[in-house]
């Protein structure tokens, strides 16, 4: 096992918080490993005055980091999964995710509590075509203007009156301790589906790096890993970019297994690693989509808490036509469900 890990990440405050959360998980299982953060400035960080769809999409937040991985300048990379395109470079793989946080969006406004309450022709700052499509579906009269930057800068722009409101991810606000209930109001899934992968921290490695794979195998939150498969399959099949209004949100129907993790079992067995391995895990399972092998928890292997419902949204390029679809599936066929939804909805949009 390696003694040191170089972890690549963006330099933003939120990205560094995400990276430290990954390090905390690594330290739970490998307390003696030295974790070195390697901050990397990406093209997406440098270009702030244009919408992402005009400059290459969300991949601009990954390009330099993934290149550092390929060049072996770092050992693993930490991303917000919502920024990761459906297709990544062939030698790389998303090998682990942390437990998903609440993926809802937040309506941020000083005077009003919802999009519906805004006055006629009010201005909302947002560069996401997904959010723009939902906003215009709810209130066609509203003007949506380009609004980029980190969480703090967007809130400052709101405070100075550049826009009447903006929409941000709850997870980012929470982790930055910037969620203020006086002007931050959660938007329910029924009104605005989250971005694919929203609320999930992802760890990317080289496929052939067995040392990093062993680490990822330990820190990977399997219930979340399974949950995002239909969302990611939907995104990958459509090869969607920042010009396409697209959203998906998956949830377990039978129960909420988000706390089904090795750490939880470790606590339950009071640190008895041998008992943990024997009682909590049934068998190895190779993931067809990544080629990686993980130990599968008994509850999931036995079919408990394994039915997934995914709500999908897809719009045409100008957002004038939006279609919705819901798939319910077992974890064994969740990837196929995402592909099925993509095919059906693409056909509906193209009619």
UniProtKB/Swiss-Prot annotation:
InterPro entries: HemC (IPR000860), Porphobilin_deaminase_cofac_BS (IPR022419), Porphobilin_deaminase_N (IPR022417), Porphobilinogen_deaminase_C (IPR022418), Porphobilinogen_deaminase_C_sf (IPR036803), RPE1 (IPR005728). This is Porphobilinogen deaminase. Pathway: Porphyrin-containing compound metabolism; protoporphyrin-IX biosynthesis; coproporphyrinogen-III from 5-aminolevulinate: step 2/4. Its cofactor is dipyrromethane. Its EC number is 2.5.1.61. One of its GO terms (biological process) is protoporphyrinogen IX biosynthetic process. Binds 1 dipyrromethane group covalently. NCBIfam families: hemC, RPE1. The modification S-(dipyrrolylmethanemethyl)cysteine is found at residue 242. It catalyses: 4 porphobilinogen + H2O = hydroxymethylbilane + 4 NH4(+).
